[in-house]
Amino acid sequence: MKTLSLRVDVDTLQGSLSGIPTLLKILDKHHIKAGFYFSFGPDNSGRAIRRIFRKGFLSKMSRTNPVKLYGIKTMLYGTLWPAPIIFKESKEWMRRAEEEGHEVGIHAWDHVDYHDLLDHKSETWLNQWFQQAHDAFHEVFGRAAKAAVSPAWRCNDQTLLIQEKYGLDYAGDCRGTEPFYPIVQGQVLKTLQIPT
């Protein structure tokens, strides 16, 4: 029998408030457990418009119909509409995922900014970003996070070294076929990477 791992990245407030409850019902019905990884900070989904000039962005938008998928309000968060702090409005559903036996971890503080601006951010910004996510996780679950997965499988030497400070059991920051321990600047890191 093969083992399958199911990773659920919750990127938006809408995903937290309607996606989590829907998925929990489906998973419960089929007796399936998953790993839920939450975005905790501002839902800046509207800022994804910065991607408009990237290759493939417009075709993806025409395929997925983001207004139908996310709703107009979500599409405006962080631009014309204030960005809500996701965990402040969705703690109940985040906790429910863990209560129902699913693994929980950190996906992001600010998903859109990390995804789009990682290569342009300083070590100070990244440290603050990770700390805010870990603080929010602790506020929701009353304990430290043991897992983190990065938005869009984006990482670099700085992010991998910063994660080492948190004593995670594992992270999922890249694509690949088997778990490994990254080597950064000649140092074998202690945080196991489980690619997807």
Regions from the PLM with identified roles:
Residues 196:
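Active-site donor-binding loop signature of nucleotide-sugar glycosyltransferases
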Residues 1-147, 152-193:
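Catalytic alpha-helical scaffold of carbohydrate-active enzymes acting on polysaccharides/glycoconjugates
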